[in-house]
């Protein structure tokens, strides 16, 4: 492993709706037994007895590591929370199909012990830093500009590092990181880009004129989107979170922050294998042995014992 520093204070980030109390209490008990303080956002204080409630800014500033309890959406929220001061983030899988989360609840005890001991590999993730007037947003997957029904379309001119590239007229425009290329961008017809390659993917959805194919640009590039006079009112979303509207005359700027996220990997080879299988869910069918790989470890063991 990479010999990361020990974690002395860990933050818990919880799925916003699902009941994760049982697993959260296990984290608190295991961490406290090793003399490690557990922080939680004040809005979640009632869900985690024994954790220290703090404001979001304090949590991001004080934590040496984060444990995310949920799916990929919760994991993305945890990464955004500490993007200004990146610390290792461990994802515990309590949601739906996910590419970022790695650990199942049955593996929590050993996974948390390794996190606290610094016995893990870090997987760096780039983020998009988005500016639209006075608004600021961070996205680890993607930025989307989407039309409202009956209120016009996306009509925007793209400049790359200050040089005009072309224009878009479409229903939605998605700017994705390489890691986020398997999400909204892929659904809109964009390519899958390996995070090890890096890059920014710009994909129009339902293009009518202008640039009609996806673009793959360098992470060193900065993007400027000028919304033209014929542009409709658009929803601005970062990782699926709404950040209000933009419209004609507005300018949206996007730059990449490299290594803005530090994702904990305990067994990178196994995670990569599972991720490849999960990607195949986007284009069914799956082989039975591939479906078996997606099951939690304890379920696979029971199935193998029965078949043996």
Describe the role of every protein-language-model region.
Residues 1-65, 69, 106-121, 132-136:
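ATP/NTP phosphate-donor binding region
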Residues 15, 67, 71, 93, ...:
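A residue-level signal for conserved active-site and pocket-lining positions in enzyme catalytic cores
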Residues 20-23, 73-79, 127, 182-186:
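Short glycine/serine/threonine-rich phosphate/pyrophosphate-binding segments
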Residues 26-31, 83-84, 189-193, 219, ...:
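Short, solvent-exposed amphipathic alpha-helical segments in soluble enzyme
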Residues 37, 86-88:
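Proline-centered loop/turn at the N-terminus of a beta-strand
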Residues 95-172:
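Catalytic core of DAGKc-family lipid kinases
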Residues 137, 145, 161-164, 213-308:
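ATP/nucleoside-binding phosphotransfer catalytic cores, i.e., glycine-rich phosphate-binding loops
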Residues 153, 163, 167-211:
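Gly/Ser/Thr-rich active-site loops/lids in small-molecule metabolic enzymes
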């Amino acid at each position: 492993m990479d010999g990361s520093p020990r974690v002395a204070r860990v933050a818990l980030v919880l799925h916003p709706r699902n009941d994760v109390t049982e697993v959260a209490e296990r984290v608190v008990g295991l961490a406290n037994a090793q003399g490690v303080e557990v922080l939680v956002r004040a809005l979640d204080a009632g869900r985690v007895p024994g954790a220290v409630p703090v404001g979001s800014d304090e949590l991001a500033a004080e934590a040496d590591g984060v444990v995310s309890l949920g799916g990929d959406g919760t994991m993305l929220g945890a990464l955004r929370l500490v993007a200004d001061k990146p610390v290792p983030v461990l994802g515990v899988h309590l949601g739906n199909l996910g590419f970022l989360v790695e650990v199942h609840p049955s593996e929590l005890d050993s996974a948390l012990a390794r996190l606290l001991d610094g016995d893990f590999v870090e997987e760096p993730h780039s983020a998009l830093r988005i500016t639209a007037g006075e608004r600021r947003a961070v996205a680890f997957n993607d930025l989307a500009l989407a039309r409202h029904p009956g209120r016009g379309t996306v009509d925007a001119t793209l400049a790359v590092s200050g040089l005009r590239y072309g224009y878009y007229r479409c229903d939605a425009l998605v700017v994705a990181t390489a890691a986020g290329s398997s999400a909204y961008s892929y659904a809109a017809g964009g390519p899958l880009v390996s995070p090890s390659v890096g890059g920014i993917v710009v994909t129009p959805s339902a293009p009518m004129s202008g640039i009609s194919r996806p673009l793959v640009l360098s992470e060193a590039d900065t993007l400027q989107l000028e919304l033209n006079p014929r542009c409709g009112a658009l929803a601005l979303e970062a990782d699926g979170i709404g950040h209000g509207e933009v419209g004609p005359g507005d300018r949206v700027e996007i730059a990449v922050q490299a290594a803005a996220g530090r994702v904990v990997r305990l067994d990178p080879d196994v995670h990569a294998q599972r991720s490849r299988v999960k990607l195949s869910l986007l284009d069914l069918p799956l082989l039975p042995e591939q479906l078996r790989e997606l099951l939690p470890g304890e379920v696979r063991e029971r199935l193998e014992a029965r078949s043996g």
